[in-house]
Amino acid sequence: GINKDAIITVEPNKKYMVQGIKFETIPAYNINKTFHPKENDWVGYVIELNDIRYYIAGDTDITEENKRVKCDVAFVPVGGTYTMDFKEAAQLINEMQPKVAVPIHYGSIVGTKQDAEEFIKLLNQNIKGTILMR
């Protein structure tokens, strides 16, 4: 487990190292919705493990900050309503150009497995789409 003395409060646009794990925070917010305002300072994460960079977007739309993320694997919401939808998520991924993209945030509150499947179809051919939630 993680030593509770290592638990920290994070802020957007910062780099951290906790118990040897490097990560940075990327602002996560809505552009044209009120659910996740930028002022709340909520974040997604880029975590580096074994020289592989993983981006976990969190609840967000396409933003100037996440368009600049450099990563190998990206986990992005596709459910719409509270976050970007599958078309917007594919647009973001095609701009970011990770090696692998994984759709998240669908199938329970909003979004469907079909959203995840449609997301995969919209990815550039050089990006591998992977559905983890069946």
Predicted regions and their residues:
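Core dinuclear metal-dependent hydrolase active-site scaffold
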Residues: 9-70, 84, 134
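Residues at alpha-helix termini
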Residues: 1-2, 19, 96
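Short, Lys/Arg-enriched charge-dense amphipathic segments
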Residues: 31-37, 81, 103, 128-129
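Metallo-beta-lactamase
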Residues: 46-111
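Binuclear metal-ion centers of metallo-dependent hydrolases, dominated by the metallo-beta-lactamase
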Residues: 8-15, 90, 94-134
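Helix-loop-beta element that forms the nucleotide-linked donor phosphate-binding surface
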Residues: 1-9
